Amino acid sequence: VEWTDFERATIKDIFSKLEYDVVGPATLARCLVVYPWTQRYFGKFGNLYNATAIAENAMVSKHGTTILHGLDRAVKNMDDIKNTYAELSVLHSEKLHVDPDNFKLLADCLTIVVAARFGSAFTGEVQAAFEKFMAVVVSSLGRQYH
């Protein structure tokens, strides 16, 4: 993947401004509410019966924050995201048996949450850079499935 200077700077800027403990939980909660079939991967998280229960679930919050911090690895290794996530791809495919389509759903939810947080600063150009970055992450996480 070729990154422009603008794309690199934009991705680093976005992640430097994110409140991980807010955006991560909001992203995972949104995914679990909008795409309820994704809840099957989180059976040990307890009460996921409705949007309020999901939003208030401490395990959802913790894992959402963990996911967002996991993206730091991609931000720091933008030239080698596929290898950066090789082990994580194996874990999700072989041990956790996560449908790789769910990575895209989560990425879409993150894009929505980030757009809402950034407001008018999340211009079309910024969104294009962010979605390109997330597409590379999604592809890398799904790599083991191919």
Curated annotation (Swiss-Prot):
GO cellular component, one term: blood microparticle
SUPFAM superfamilies to which the protein is assigned, alphabetical: Globin-like
Tissue specificity: Red blood cells.
Example of a GO biological process term: hydrogen peroxide catabolic process
Gene Ontology MF annotations: haptoglobin binding; heme binding; metal ion binding; organic acid binding; oxygen binding; oxygen carrier activity; peroxidase activity
Residue numbers binding heme b: H63, H92
Stored InterPro entries: Globin, Globin-like_sf, Globin/Proto, Hemoglobin_b, Hemoglobin_oxygen_transport
Domain Globin: 2-146
Keyword Metal-binding carried by entry: yes
Keyword list, A-Z: Heme, Iron, Metal-binding, Oxygen transport, Transport
Transmembrane feature ranges: none
Family: Belongs to the globin family.
Subunit structure: HbC is a heterotetramer of two alpha chains and two beta-C chains.
Function per UniProt: Involved in oxygen transport from gills to the various peripheral tissues.
Miscellaneous comment text of the record: This fish has three hemoglobins: Hb1 (major) and two minor hemoglobins (about 1-2% of the total).
Protein's name according to its UniProt entry: Hemoglobin subunit beta-C
